[in-house]
From Swiss-Prot:
Post-translation changes: Does not seem to be N-glycosylated.
UniProt protein name: Protein CLN8
Gene Ontology cellular-component annotations: endoplasmic reticulum; endoplasmic reticulum membrane; endoplasmic reticulum-Golgi intermediate compartment; endoplasmic reticulum-Golgi intermediate compartment membrane; membrane; mitochondrion; presynapse
Any single GO BP term: retinal rod cell apoptotic process
Domain of life: Eukaryota
Taxonomic classification: Eukaryota, Metazoa, Chordata, Craniata, Vertebrata
S-S pairs: none
Protein topology in the membrane: Multi-pass membrane protein
InterPro entries with a match to the protein in the record: TLC-dom (IPR006634), TLCD (IPR050846)
Species in which this protein is naturally found: Homo sapiens
Disease: Ceroid lipofuscinosis, neuronal, 8: A form of neuronal ceroid lipofuscinosis with onset in childhood. Neuronal ceroid lipofuscinoses are progressive neurodegenerative, lysosomal storage diseases characterized by intracellular accumulation of autofluorescent liposomal material, and clinically by seizures, dementia, visual loss, and/or cerebral atrophy. The lipopigment patterns observed most often in neuronal ceroid lipofuscinosis type 8 comprise mixed combinations of granular, curvilinear, and fingerprint profiles.
Task of the protein: Could play a role in cell proliferation during neuronal differentiation and in protection against cell death.
Amino acid sequence: MNPASDGGTSESIFDLDYASWGIRSTLMVAGFVFYLGVFVVCHQLSSSLNATYRSLVAREKVFWDLAATRAVFGVQSTAAGLWALLGDPVLHADKARGQQNWCWFHITTATGFFCFENVAVHLSNLIFRTFDLFLVIHHLFAFLGFLGCLVNLQAGHYLAMTTLLLEMSTPFTCVSWMLLKAGWSESLFWKLNQWLMIHMFHCRMVLTYHMWWVCFWHWDGLVSSLYLPHLTLFLVGLALLTLIINPYWTHKKTQQLLNPVDWNFAQPEAKSRPEGNGQLLRKKRP
């Protein structure tokens, strides 16, 4: 199947020759550079304008900038995923093999983002000697999965777009963590955002069940359009997300609503500075 037309728009950012590897690889690089730019701009603006950011240690600043970058990507992914899930007739006509030019744009730029994300996470882990297993697995599977879609002109776009919709929680996660660091964990706004974020994580779980349903009813189309390693990677990743990662993150975010602490950093810092005023620091942290 050749990359499909997006319904007749003659001059559009989506109206490119996506059968060309040069176009697809260029957009992937553009996605990497764009989100690297978001990361750098966030650092510059936060350093200039935000007192909370200036008070953070280096590792927390990196996490802040990554959270903001993920939030921007989350907005892009949510818009694209919702349209694929609810509105695009071509994708709904063939959920296994249907393609759209606008989907090619999001797949290529998302591949660039996940490449950036993997580089950033691994560099951060190397520099700060940390390791988040679930996050590493999540983004490795995401990058390899979207890279598989990018190189395979036969791959359908519906499941790729609904996978992007799983990023619906990232803007709320970003807001939650930034407000937590700013000491706003008792505010009504933080609690409302936390409720919405938990709801988004539950929606993610429901969405994974829908994706399994699509796989079951369109199995023959998936087998004929995806390479076996790519299909295996997708199914293993979806299983990990459904059975382990989504439930774990939903549990942790619910815990955080009831006990608003920064579980990304509080425990390691407490261990690294156990003497003196370590207990006082733990109490001060939101």
